[in-house]
């Protein structure tokens, strides 16, 4: 489970896609504050690529960019906020939210942490490495992730989901590595900054794991939650 927890069971494909679009629109809006040109705005370029891979309609994508760049005259201001704490059984996690109302979000996150423990800033961040995370799939069966990591400038790599590879980078190298991976035989599926646990919790029973997953799913269902990084082995 490690770096990033993902919901295992989506209720419906349409709802799942709608939620993905909602998260991407917020991310695009924030990124576009630094300019609407993807050629000069690396963060925006990364998120736009993710939106295209998710088949976001062009109209939705363009509107989000213009909204973030202030070209539509709208005043909605999104803020990125990070919460730290523990899931049941002292599993550390970092929760990233994007919200237009911080007071509302923190109150609702406190409620969501009822069965866990919401901590102060820095309470678990020390137990994670801040890294770039690039999920990429091999173009051919013989593509070598170790060689690709070395040649592209990644710090490390690990097996991802469905045959993909997760390449880990220094945060400042994220854009350069994701640009270099296609030359090494890998198609980039997503690229972002995230947190890698240093000491993931292991040895939980099936019952304990079920409690942790139920807690995480409840958090993930919150509209303002963009990402969760969980110190859980498996």
From Swiss-Prot:
Name of protein: Probable transcriptional regulatory protein Pfl01_3677
PANTHER family reported in the protein's UniProt record: TRANSLATIONAL ACTIVATOR OF CYTOCHROME C OXIDASE 1
Gene Ontology molecular functions: DNA binding
Pfam families on file: TACO1_YebC_N (PF20772), Transcrip_reg (PF01709)
Keyword Transcription: yes
Disulfide bonds: none
Biological processes, Gene Ontology terms: regulation of DNA-templated transcription
